[in-house]
């Protein structure tokens, strides 16, 4: 007997559903996987029998499990269950919406927020830097990018931006259109201040020595706004 991958998946789902059914009968509360398997296996079997329509199984799927049949939080995790089931007239997608009524006790990942504003980067001193995009393409900078190493076509005082990032909310960004000039607020990068990656201008601890090296590299590589001391002589291993 040879089975296709899809047939093997259905067979595995049947086994999982039967196991979940036995555990339910023994009074064991089902977890997320077991709950989905039980509902899916039941729908597949009833569809194969051919005595009920897809619409009837969509409704019946909502009656198989009660909140007390599953672990706390499981009901709120299952918004819908979709099963491709074989009916006498062909394969149909049966979607069971909200298959388990939620008691509203515990919702995994639920956030309880205070009814007040959140001050980002509180206690960090910010500096203002004027930046101009001298390139011909838009440039977008993320919140935690080392601002010293941003696109070479952004012209600003890079020395002031060493070891700093944008003073904006995490995950947001600032966009500079071609020819656009505007001021941005920068704050110190937190943590142990070991800066690696980005445009590989630092790749070490952010201190005064590494700033001189980084400025030298930036000037050599054509980053606008990078001014290096011509009298500063040091061997730099690239």
From Swiss-Prot:
GO terms for biological process: urea catabolic process. This is Urease subunit alpha. It comes from Helicobacter acinonychis (strain Sheeba). It is found in: Cytoplasm. Its EC number is 3.5.1.5. The keyword Nucleotidyltransferase does not apply. GO terms for molecular function: nickel cation binding; urease activity. Heterohexamer of 3 UreA (alpha) and 3 UreB (beta) subunits. Gene3D superfamilies: Urease, beta subunit, Urease, gamma-like subunit. It is an enzyme of class 3 (hydrolase). Residues 1-102 are annotated as: Urease gamma. The keyword GTP-binding does not apply. It catalyses: urea + 2 H2O + H(+) = hydrogencarbonate + 2 NH4(+). Residues 103-238 are annotated as: Urease beta. Pathway: Nitrogen metabolism; urea degradation; CO(2) and NH(3) from urea (urease route): step 1/1. One of its GO terms (cellular component) is urease complex. The gene is ureA. PANTHER family: UREASE (PTHR33569:SF1). In the N-terminal section; belongs to the urease gamma subunit family. Pfam families: Urease_beta, Urease_gamma. InterPro entries: Urease_beta-like, Urease_betasu_sf, Urease_gamma-beta_su, Urease_gamma/gamma-beta_su, Urease_gamma_sf, Urease_subunit. Keywords: Cytoplasm, Hydrolase. Its main location: cytoplasm.
